[in-house]
Regions:
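Polysaccharide-binding surfaces and accessory modules of carbohydrate-active proteins
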Residues: 1-214
Length: 214
């Protein structure tokens, strides 16, 4: 039996300890193969073919400015314009380090995010999936807003209520385009340019991509 306001996949016959259920908790960067059945950001397979990754906080660093992403297009700013938080996490069994970077452009009201993996172990690891970010938040009857279009008319707004399950915008063309724009926003009903809540996520540049709400 599930009580009202129970986490979606947590069976319970009493009100005692539920902390063993990972899908009961908000996750900053969820990983696959450890018992959380929501969408993961990172799936890693080891040399034995086993898939599972569990990262834990190690340390963090805050500094002015923003480091370049080697080989990738990215936003940039001076030490006066942007401040960055790097969070180092690690899976000790795999010897895998994960660096989560958050750069705050305060005047623009923008936070940019990126992820870097560092293999410190002795085995080869296969990255099955890696996503740039996760935003785990309470539902406020959000609607999902996406953009699509055609040549010379790229920005048609499509908006509708979030349904149970998963909704997404994606592309497997190897590039982003007017057909599927790499942008998703969650907005409260009745939101305008002057009022309402808007949480938007957008790739600076993109090949194949997926933006998904669950």
């Amino acid at each position: 039996m599930l009580r009202m306001e129970e986490p979606p996949y947590t069976p319970s016959v009493n009100k005692r300890e539920k902390s063993s259920f990972l899908d009961s908790f908000p996750m900053e960067y969820p990983t696959g193969g450890i018992g959380d059945y929501r969408e993961s950001c990172l799936n890693v397979r080891n040399e034995a073919g086993q898939m599972g990754c569990e990262i834990h906080y190690v340390s963090h660093e805050i500094y002015n400015g923003k480091k370049a992403l080697k080989g990738l297009p990215a936003s940039f700013g001076t030490e006066e314009e942007v401040q960055t938080l790097d969070i180092l996490c690690e899976d000790e069994i795999l010897g895998l380090q994960v660096v989560l970077s958050y750069s705050v452009f305060e005047k623009e009201n923008v936070i940019t995010r990126s992820v870097k993996l560092i293999n410190k172990g002795n085995q080869k690891l296969k990255i099955e999936k890696i996503y740039s970010a996760c935003l785990d938040m309470d539902n406020e009857n959000f609607e999902m807003l996406t953009l699509h279009g055609a040549w010379a008319r790229e920005r048609h707004i499509q908006q509708g209520p979030l349904r149970y399950g998963k909704q997404m915008v994606s592309s497997i063309k190897g590039e982003s385009s007017h057909q599927e724009h790499p942008f998703v926003a969650l907005v409260t009903p009745g939101t305008t340019q002057q009022q309402g809540k808007v949480y938007g996520m957008h790739f600076v540049y993109s090949g194949n991509f997926i933006g998904q709400a669950e």
